[in-house]
Amino acid sequence: MNTSVKKFVENKNFKKKLFTPGPASLLYENITSIEPCFGRGDYQYQKIENNVLSKLKKISNHKNIARMQGSASFALEVMINNFIYGKLLIIKTGIYSDRLLSMSIACKTNFKKIKKIDYIDYQKIDELTTKYDWVMGCPVETSVGLKIPISKLNKLKKRCKAKLALDATASIGLE
């Protein structure tokens, strides 16, 4: 392990206090593993991409994965506009669930696939048994430092006879 890089990372992370859950902004592994990648025709890039996609397929139990480059918000728009339909329950947890609500309302207005949206506080989900097509939420709501176990959301999904869609864009390393 390169101690000068490790000290650099420690010093940078020490200078700025983060009061949200999750790993530090600057990680030793990110600094030491970074390398230039071109994409098309780049063997090293292809090797890394294949490794990542193989792991994603394994943990998600999917045969195929569509990959796109973009922000977390873009990923959520893709999810909502392409998969969510019918009667939707969004779990209210904070700013990021508000973003899901806003995007879902836009999708409902523009594409008419979403028929009804209920927005219910996370503290009330144990009471729910209403049938939905989809349950959507943010298991890690960094705006308020909240983490809801995915297993709890999975139980809700089963009670509501729904599919589960999660905004896990802020939860890397926190599950």
Please state what every model-predicted region is:
Residues 109-117:
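Short beta-strand elements in bilobed, periplasmic/extracellular small-molecule ligand-binding domains
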Residues 1-43:
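N-terminal "arm"/small-domain region of PLP-dependent enzymes with the aminotransferase-like
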Residues 83-98:
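Conserved PLP-anchoring active-site segment centered on the Schiff-base-forming lysine
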Residues 120-173:
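Active-site phosphate-binding strand-loop segment of PLP-dependent enzymes
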Residues 32-78, 82, 99, 103:
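Conserved N-terminal alpha-helix of the aminotransferase class I/II PLP-enzyme fold
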Residues 18-20, 66-69, 113, 136-137, ...:
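General beta-strand structural signal in soluble alpha/beta enzymes
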Residues 64, 87, 133-134:
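Structural motif
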